[in-house]
């Protein structure tokens, strides 16, 4: 379940245990039952290869960029669309057959994406590749189930990883990109 963060709309995205991804537009105008006055509009964004239970729905830089993860064995667990769900790309790459619980894209470098799995945190710096290369990013954390990933933008984009039974860990994206570039000469200071 996720709501696209737009103050002028109320679009709700719902993932089911059966692998369906539903979009509810005008969700704030929904009324229960078979009410003809309900203005909520339901549509399916379910991909043809969606099998298993949806564990997370996240957005990229706009509402058309959607990341969906599944937490089952023996299936593809990471899907991405940049066209609002008209078509989906599988992004498991070299990831072992492990359930994926959550996903988070670096807002400063869209190529860098991290996932929370049954065996800790994994990352890629080439998400747009047809077969992204995933690497472990545990940084002192054991092979523990990650239940959620969150980003605190006001704290230099600090990432928090909630675990099953071992508390919460925090770190930063591993991007090589600097947050800020400063240059100066004798007469001026430039910040990019």
Question: Can you annotate each of these PLM segments?
Answer:
Residues 1-182:
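Extracellular glycan-interacting surfaces
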Residues 181-191:
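Short, solvent-exposed loop/edge segments of extracellular or virion-exposed proteins
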């Amino acid at each position: 379940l996720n709501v696209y963060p737009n103050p002028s709309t109320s679009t709700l995205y719902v993932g089911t245990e059966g692998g369906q991804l539903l979009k509810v537009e005008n969700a704030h105008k929904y009324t229960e039952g078979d009410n003809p006055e309900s203005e909520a509009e339901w549509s399916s964004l379910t991909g043809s290869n969606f099998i298993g239970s949806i564990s997370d729905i996240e957005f990229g830089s706009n509402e058309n960029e959607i990341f969906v993860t599944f937490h089952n064995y023996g299936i593809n667990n990471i899907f991405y669309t940049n066209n609002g769900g008209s078509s989906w790309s599988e992004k498991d790459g070299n990831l072992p057959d492990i359930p994926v619980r959550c996903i988070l894209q670096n807002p400063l470098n869209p190529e860098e994406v991290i996932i929370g799995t049954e065996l800790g945190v994994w990352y890629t710096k080439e998400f747009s590749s047809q077969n992204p290369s995933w690497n472990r990013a545990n940084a002192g954390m054991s092979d523990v189930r990650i239940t959620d990933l969150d980003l605190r933008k006001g704290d230099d984009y600090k990432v928090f990883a909630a675990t099953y039974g071992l508390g919460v860990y925090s770190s930063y994206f591993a991007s090589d990109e600097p947050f800020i570039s400063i240059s100066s000469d004798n007469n001026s200071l430039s910040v990019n």
